[in-house]
UniProtKB/Swiss-Prot annotation:
Belongs to the AB hydrolase superfamily. Hydrolase RutD family. It comes from Enterobacter cloacae subsp. cloacae (strain ATCC 13047 / DSM 30054 / NBRC 13535 / NCTC 10005 / WDCM 00083 / NCDC 279-56). The keyword Hydrolase applies. It catalyses: carbamate + 2 H(+) = NH4(+) + CO2. The keyword DNA damage does not apply. One of its GO terms (biological process) is uracil catabolic process. GO terms for molecular function: hydrolase activity, acting on carbon-nitrogen (but not peptide) bonds, in linear amides. Keywords: Hydrolase. This is Putative carbamate hydrolase RutD.
Amino acid sequence: MKLSVSPPPFDGAPVVVLIAGLGGGGSYWLPQLAALEQEYQVVCYDQRGTGNNPDTLPEEYTLAQMAGELAQALTAVGITRYCVVGHALGALIGLQLALDTPDALKALVCVNGWLTLNAHTRRCFQIRERLLHAGGAQAWVEAQPLFLYPADWMAARAPRLEAEEALALAHFQGKNNLLRRLNALKKADFSRHAARMACPVHLICSADDLLVPSVCSSELQAALPHSHSVVMRQGGHACNVTEPETFNTLLLNGLASLLHSHEPAL
């Protein structure tokens, strides 16, 4: 699997791995790259079956496979100790890494993640799946911004949304791959395992997230033994895109706090 690895800003710089959500593309994190690369060696990637890592995913694709593929790719380029910043599905992959490769994961930032799928989030995905089956990629892509962005933000950026839609259609991951990744996401449940996650976790969520209610982060924090959280007042599901200055400050402060906190013995 191809990775994009930035040069370290100084010798011994910590490594931060960025994991996108269901869309899978590493470009999702573009608003964060400049700020992060001043202090960290940053790894971005397109998840298997998306972007520049095209593949046909197996029918019973799992979250554990997603995490394993990333861990293997990082090891292959000599990265054996790192922090993860994950958004939604990316946060779930980070949680899976915390279980499966605890010696490798120094710290985790979960953005709009969850412990187990909330009934509201399930409803949103059911609606989106119906749109996909009825109207194909076009319908999925056209509806996507409604779940990602606040209404006022979208209303002020119609040309940008049109350009994003065209790009998303041109690079659509394919119906089968999308549904297999989505099924893996829906099956994820950390409620029985969160208590044994040893790495420190910082949670960021947005109070106006339409897709993943902010209570999901509260539930996740309550289940994780070494965690703290912050709630953005606005920004929607893609709060790192719509409110990058606020988000980047919270992210950098959160990472600094995690890396300077006492890591529990593994």
